[in-house]
């Protein structure tokens, strides 16, 4: 299930999220995610990949590792859709399991490719799932569904340093085994 938010409604959501983030900063922990974005015990090599992309991203932004306030301020831009004029939210029926979650990921990648074909850019933002009640109440997600993810949609700024960032790639042979392929 997809909800697309733009215009005055998106501005309203951005204002709601600014207030919500201020409440969280003041200690309000009443809203909890419905699923973990990462396993509680993320191990190597996945922990290392996650760490490295974070380091590369903040280095491009000129934000030092020890400047937690600047890092949090940057992260909060997620909830402004990075200035994009449109946000997409995806929710899924609670009865669905891992295969359907995979289907949603494949569907969203197809949406992102189709957006690109139409000259639009997108940024998948699973961080929205940290606020399922806030988002669910705003867009009217029924109780039988849960918020899966969000996505910013618009035109990227080619001058922004993050838009030139390319994550390091693991060598193919570290995650692929070939059988009967020469």
PLM region descriptions:
Residues 1-182:
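Acidic, surface-exposed loops and disordered segments
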């Amino acid at each position: 299930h997809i909800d697309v938010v733009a215009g005055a409604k998106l501005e309203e959501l951005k204002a709601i999220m600014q207030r919500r983030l201020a409440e969280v900063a003041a200690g309000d922990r009443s809203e909890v995610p419905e699923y973990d974005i990462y396993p509680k015990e993320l191990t190597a090599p996945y922990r290392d990949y996650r760490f490295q992309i974070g380091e590369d991203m903040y280095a491009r932004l000129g934000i030092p590792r020890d400047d937690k306030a600047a890092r949090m301020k940057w992260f909060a831009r997620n909830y402004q859709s990075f200035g994009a004029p449109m946000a997409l939210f995806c929710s899924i029926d609670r009865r669905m399991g891992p295969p359907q979650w995979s289907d949603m990921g494949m569907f969203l990648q197809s949406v992102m490719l189709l957006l690109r074909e139409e000259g639009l850019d997108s940024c998948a933002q699973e961080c929205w799932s940290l606020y399922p009640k806030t988002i669910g109440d705003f867009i009217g997600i029924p109780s039988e569904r849960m918020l899966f993810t969000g996505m910013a949609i618009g035109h990227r700024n080619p001058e922004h340093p993050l838009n030139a960032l390319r994550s390091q790639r693991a060598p193919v042979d570290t995650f692929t085994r070939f059988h009967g392929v020469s």
